[in-house]
Amino acid sequence: MGQNWKRQQKLWNVPQLPFIRVPPSIYDTSLLKALNQGQQRYFYSIMRIYNSRPQWEALQTRYIHSLQHQQLLGYITQREALSYALVLRDSTKRASAKVAPQRTIPRKTSAMTRRCPSVLPVSVVLPRAQSKRRQVLRN
């Protein structure tokens, strides 16, 4: 009986790998369709490692907790805390919905672009141009 108990204890100490469950929504992706179940689990585990969404969510909650703490200490008002939280929520919505736009306008060659901006503002008219106009008007 004692030997059997020792064997069971040895089996308990063996580290077990966590079971990776691939969600059904991921099964239909083109990357995982041709793979068998073990390959799908392995690939999904890699996808989870490189997913930045949990880090973003943790950063957002940390920022919200920081806002609440500053409000409790009296550094900011409740209205300010709510406005900051709304800005955070709206910016994350825009960032998640943003798709890289396609560039349709061809870039100019380096010879066509200005290397240094003009020193004069746009509204300044050169005196020589004004004097030429006056000469044309006088004739």
From Swiss-Prot:
Q: What is this protein called?
A: Protein FAM216B
Checking InterPro entries in the record gives: FAM216
Specify the superkingdom. Eukaryota
The record's comment on protein family reads: Belongs to the FAM216 family.
State a single Pfam family of this protein: FAM216B
